[in-house]
Amino acid sequence: MTRETSTLTTSPTETSPPETGKTETTPGSAHDPAAAVPLMERIGYGCGDLASNFIWQAMSIFIVYYYTDVIGVAAGIIGSIMLFSRVFDGVSDIAMGYVIDKTTSRHGKARPWLLWLAVPFAVSAVLLFAVPDVSPFWQTVYIAVTYNLVCLVYTGLNVPYGTLNSLITQDQYQRSLLNVFRMSLALVGVLLVSNLTLPVATLFGGGQGGWIVTFAIFGAIGTGLFLFTFKSTRERVQPADEKRRQAPVPLKQSLRTLGKNRYWALATLFILITYIFNALNSGAVVYYAQYLLDDTWLVGVITTAYIVFILAGMAFVAPITKRYGKRNAIIVGELITLVGYGVMLIDLGNVYLIVAGTIIRGLGKAPINGSMFALLGDTIEYGEWKTGIRNEGMVYSGGSMGIKIGSGLGTALLGWILAFGGYVGGGGEQSDTALFAIQALFVYLPMGLCALMIVLMLFYDLDKRYPAIVADLAAKR
């Protein structure tokens, strides 16, 4: 019987994971990785994703629109830049995960990166919008360089930020709570930037100057929030073997460990597809509101309806996932999302039906947002149980890679499909094929992705195995 199919209880005949896979637990102490995480620390952890969304989500929603309708760059060129950049950046995620696993400092292995890179992230975002008035070729070069710079710095922040969840606690329910706070505050960020970006840019004169000032403000806010996350969190989960702390696992061995972790592959692929969905949903809404509903201010209305009802649903995610499991909650959420799209399909030009369908989609998205990164965190213990190697940084690099490549593919699809449909930037009248392309981006493609994510989750059964895996690991300490 292979290790994969053997029972989880320890017996003399079974092959136990090497002792280097152990984790340190000091029951009853402030450093106990199974203890309840204090409320302020949950809030502080969640503020990290709020910080990211002041820049990253604002970019996801408006960057294609800014480049096509403010700067005047062709949509197809932007789509190609986005895809190349995100795929390249996905490779850097793996490298960053390895760097985190090797990091040793008095602040821990993940937290110090929040301190070191908060300011560079804000500066790089401002540079992204400061496109010089030069020839189209050099504008394209500038956009490619600055966009890759933003992605690279974001990697340096987001991989350690995601890893921090698994270093704060080893308890499955506490991780779910942290993820609920993370995604709830992330949604607050989405709500704020989707409603404030256009008005603030207009307030500061509109055009390129208004956008630069807007992102300078967002960058300053994001920097402060990242520093708050750094100050308010603690790393508690440590490898028990002192040699392991001083001599991290070689890169080749760490990559081989990921290859043996099928749940990591499923969770990473799920996150990737989710962020394709997110990029299409957030990027296409600007075009849908302007050209199908004839009012760009409806961007705020639609996005607000979506986010408010995701937040409302998030209040119930932790108890639901505790009782029924994260996988089952996600599947039900995807089905509810499909119902929301069904309501929208009744009349794709009716504002009320679009908003009603969006409200239903928001409720369905709550268990998805509230559970997907907790899914990834649980694969750390599975990998440790199966191989004896605990590599949080490498595992969470998969989540970051999924975000980057998924967002890049989604943004690239946005640009490519608009170009294929004959979209003409600048706010003019669009052809029927261009209007259908916008409908496909906002409705039809996301529906297909929902169905694909349901299929993926049918293969994820770690929820029911996790308690026995953790007990098996604890018995070997």
Task: List the model feature ranges, each with a label.
Residues 2-15, 23-477:
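Membrane-embedded alpha-helical bundles of multi-pass transporters/translocases
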